[in-house]
Amino acid sequence: MKVEFDYKSLGLKVGLEIHRQLDTKKLFSAVPSQLHDNVDFTFERRLRPTMSELGEIDQAALEEFKRGRAFVYEGNYKYTDLVYVDEEPPHMPDEEALKVALQITYLLNAIPVDEVHFMRKIVIDGSNVSGFQRTAIVGMNGKVDTPWGSVGIPTICLEEDACRIIEQGERKAIYRLDRLGIPLIEIATTPDIHHPEQAKIVAKFIGDALRATRKVKRGLGTIRQDLNVSIKGGARIEIKGVQELDMIPVIIEREVQRQLNLLKIKEELQKRGVKEEDLKEEFYDVTDIFSGTGSKIIARTLKKGGKILAIKLPKFRGLIGFEIQPGRRLGTEMADRAKKYVKGIFHIDELPNYGISQEEVDKVVERLNLGEFDAFVLVAAEEEIAKKALREILQRAREAISGVPEETRRALPDGNTQYMRPLPGKARMYPETDIPPIFMSEELKKEILENLPEYPQAKVNRYVKEYKIDKSLAQTLVDDERDELFEELIAMGIKPSLAASILVVVLKGLKKEVSTDNITETHIKDAFKLLHENKIAKEALEEIFKELALHPEKTALQVAEEKGLTLLSEGEVEKIIEEIVRENIDVVKEKGMGAMGMLMGRAMAKLRGKADGKLVNQLVRKKIQEFTS
């Protein structure tokens, strides 16, 4: 059952960060910005954190460094050069990417900067060969108006995208260099969003502005939406990787639910008098208790020479199993923290289970000398690994006493979230010394401002008013980026309603039968040209497009001729209709014009795609009158 929250009284604050790839060359070299699967070379690196310009080290970077992983990079000579293996300084930023960033700045009601200064953002998870990402502010102080009020856009940044992850491992990660350096626009809002639906409206507005440029990439992985969510008494949580617009409200609702439940746990721990110093780093070796266990997981660990270690969590019983999101508990949060070392954990609130018996549970309780409200957590692994995992669990338990820890979390498909790493600090940036400041001239700003593309929603409204087409058709044309083609067809003399119907309804319907991706804009324009020249009927379009999807090497005219879809002359059509009327003369004489429907059905069965429906109607009517007068 969906829980309704009073977001105003909860003090909900949400900010968005939207990242979208630009469809230009790479940001700091002229190689193509395309993904590929061909690997020509590989190399290995290890990365270390450095101090920011303030002399501080970012905690998220430090935590990644402690994992001690090596990074293997796969490259292709066509899509990677020396810049992106960090063996050559960056070239000057791509001019087209800068112009698109400036367009987006104006579309979001923001003010462009006078000079673009690139900075280095420390990233040592392996996704950047150099250990940093280059980023620059191009616009500031934009805004989005919503029914709940205005939401600010303090910064619009142009940056380089990271490598593509191929394989993650405990000791090694493999990345592909093809995505590294693809220009990325990053748009951040102020935390002035106070309702989940408001967040969706803001995200759509920004997405529409990006699409209006016609210079953003489409498809899986080209857009990444991050949320920053907090409530009164809770903490700021960064949620990464929200893919679908419709999931934004769901994820926010679930995060509010999670924080409220964590605050309930905090309150209960305070009632029980738990203090951080009560949670001691004392590991208990309980391996002997499980020597004859029925748990397959534990038995496998013991067979490999591993151990079963336990820690005591005073007064946590009943709270580790407390549900904080649908299907997720405080114990799940603890397990997420331990996952960098072990696959899973066992805790008292879920036992007996997983082959662990009540007798084994009782023995652990006795060994740890647990009281009525005390809990334990078990880990099965090599001794040192088990200790590392239990330290993570102990840290998460200490954080539970304070309520909601600040974290970066991963969005899950069901709307829940999962721990990724500590929230990055501000100690991540330092100046980029290889790229001089870029002056944004008044002439360039004026040129961009005077040639801004039409905003998508304004275009939808114009289509409805000017071309008298249904709003849902107009919206789909714009959302699917078929609007330019639509306007070209109208310029050819095609009726707007027909053009919209074919582009939206017919072609989408064909997707169920054939791969419409094979149908090019040239195919579509050529087919409509045949229609405009009265060489085919509009009824023939669907069959022509279906055949072109199967055989894209053919032309629309070839298909029309091969399939016998070219229009018959009026005389040929009249002759066929007269034959149909003669075959049904008794019905015609009996019903007169009442036979119109039946005759039209039979005529169209023979003439569909070979004659215009309007002409067929006129000639059927004419023949009925001739034979009944």
UniProtKB/Swiss-Prot annotation:
State how it assembles. Heterodimer of GatD and GatE.
Q: What class of enzyme is it?
A: ligase
Q: In this UniProt entry, which cysteines form S-S bonds? A: none
The protein's name in its UniProt record: Glutamyl-tRNA(Gln) amidotransferase subunit E
EC number(s) per UniProt? 6.3.5.-
Where is it found, in Gene Ontology cellular component terms?
cytoplasm
Show the GO MF annotations: aminoacyl-tRNA ligase activity; ATP binding; glutaminyl-tRNA synthase (glutamine-hydrolyzing) activity
Keyword annotations for this protein, in alphabetical order, are: ATP-binding, Ligase, Nucleotide-binding, Protein biosynthesis
Please give the catalytic activity noted in the UniProt record.
Answer: L-glutamyl-tRNA(Gln) + L-glutamine + ATP + H2O = L-glutaminyl-tRNA(Gln) + L-glutamate + ADP + phosphate + H(+)
Cross-referenced NCBIfam families: gatE_arch (TIGR00134), PRK04028.1 (NF003107)
Carries keyword Transmembrane?
no
Q: Describe the task this protein carries out.
A: Allows the formation of correctly charged Gln-tRNA(Gln) through the transamidation of misacylated Glu-tRNA(Gln) in organisms which lack glutaminyl-tRNA synthetase. The reaction takes place in the presence of glutamine and ATP through an activated gamma-phospho-Glu-tRNA(Gln). The GatDE system is specific for glutamate and does not act on aspartate.
One record GO biological process: glutaminyl-tRNAGln biosynthesis via transamidation
In terms of Pfam families, this protein maps to: GAD, GatB_N, GatB_Yqey
InterPro entries given for it?
Asn/Gln-tRNA_amidoTrfase_suB/E (IPR017959), Asn/Gln-tRNA_Trfase_suB/E_cat (IPR006075), Asn/Gln_amidotransferase (IPR018027), Asn/Gln_tRNA_amidoTrase-B-like (IPR003789), GAD-like_sf (IPR004115), GAD_dom (IPR029351), GatB_C_1 (IPR042114), GatB_Yqey_C_2 (IPR023168)
Region Disordered, as annotated, extends over 405-426
Q: Which family does it belong to?
A: Belongs to the GatB/GatE family. GatE subfamily.
Organism, per UniProt? Thermococcus sibiricus (strain DSM 12597 / MM 739)
Write down the PANTHER family for this protein, in alphabetical order. GLUTAMYL-TRNA GLN AMIDOTRANSFERASE SUBUNIT B MITOCHONDRIAL AND PROKARYOTIC PET112-RELATED (PTHR11659), GLUTAMYL-TRNA(GLN) AMIDOTRANSFERASE SUBUNIT E (PTHR11659:SF2)
